[in-house]
Amino acid sequence: NAYTTKEETLVYSVFPSGNMERAVELISDLVMNSVFPEKELEKEREVVLEEIHSYLDTPSEAIYDDFEDMIFSGNSLGHNILGTEECLSRMGTEECRRYLKSLYVPENMVLFAVGSIAEDKMFRLAERYFSPMHHTLVRNPRVPVTMSPVFSEVKSIDSHQAHTVVGVPTFGMHDNRKYALLLLNNMLGGPGMNSR
């Protein structure tokens, strides 16, 4: 299984502890040897295009992408994680391979294991299955986030509902005050009955 956020990709596996070596081998194979056949890319492209259309048809979801696009204008954090139709149409086998080889390198990776496995065994497995990786890290320096000045935007759509987003800059994720902020966020806009 895998998922992607705006800043990371996670490939993971859940398995009986006796199968740890096989799981590490499979994950390393995915990361190091993916071939991206054009036929499979086309199938996946259609799935993602459908996700994009579904998302755009759901104003309660799309409003967050619109908001992030405005507040992080000019920064990749403002981009929709699914991409755009235009971007997807340009992605082919070679583009996927280049992306994988430039970013999926040991300097950018963390191998993490939890469960019934000895630490020394995990290190041996990591060495065995990940040491053949190439080390051609392409530096993509982080673009500093510059928040847009105060703004207000109204977007009219054909809907029976209205949606709003209010956001303010806060402190970084390593600041200890984040826990109070998480509590406040849940109280103001948490799921269902939690919000005030």
Task: Locate each region found by the language model.
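Short amphipathic
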Residues: 148-157
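Short, intrinsically disordered, charge-balanced linker/junction segments flanking boundaries
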Residues: 190-196
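Generic hydrophobic alpha-helical scaffold/packing signal
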Residues: 185-188
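Charge-rich, well-structured scaffold segments of protease-associated domains
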Residues: 1-138, 144, 154, 164-165, ...
